[in-house]
Swiss-Prot record:
The keyword RNA-binding applies. One of its GO terms (cellular component) is small ribosomal subunit. One of the primary rRNA binding proteins, it binds directly to 16S rRNA where it nucleates assembly of the head domain of the 30S subunit. Part of the 30S ribosomal subunit. HAMAP family: Ribosomal_uS7_B (MF_00480_B). The gene is rps7-A. One of its GO terms (biological process) is translation. GO terms for molecular function: rRNA binding; structural constituent of ribosome. This is Small ribosomal subunit protein uS7cz/uS7cy. It comes from Phaseolus vulgaris (Kidney bean). Belongs to the universal ribosomal protein uS7 family. Its main location: plastid.
Amino acid sequence: MSRRGTAEEKTAKSDPIYRNRLVNMLVNRILKHGKKSLAYQILYRAMKNIQQKTETNPLSVLRQAIRGVTPDIAVKARRVGGSTHQVPVEIGSAQGKALAIRWLLGASRKRPGRNMAFKLSSELVDAAKGSGDAIRKKEETHRMAEANRAFAHFR
């Protein structure tokens, strides 16, 4: 156990246009090689595409997509007596959001298409509707946790 105090949890800053922490978290995950302005550009173009596709508030679509992809439970590898078991573990809201964002971006990067803004907007709209690769990933994680329910006492 650390002799120092516990580290304070950093609160995410909000972005300049939507004034939303979730948007800023997404921008920070899109970010590659320190090019934050490009990450903002990609996300804002994606939001504009969502606005044109759905004719609703893109922020509500984003929230709905992340809420749909956020897992409640995941599996964690735990070594017990020489064999490794996949132990189901409940996930907190912050970690769940982070996983959801990671899965959404991973799924949108894998999509075939012209540019990242287009792929991201398509994935967010699909996730908000309840389909897409990110939703499939969440369901797969939940299935894994359900299949390994017998090892829940190893926590």
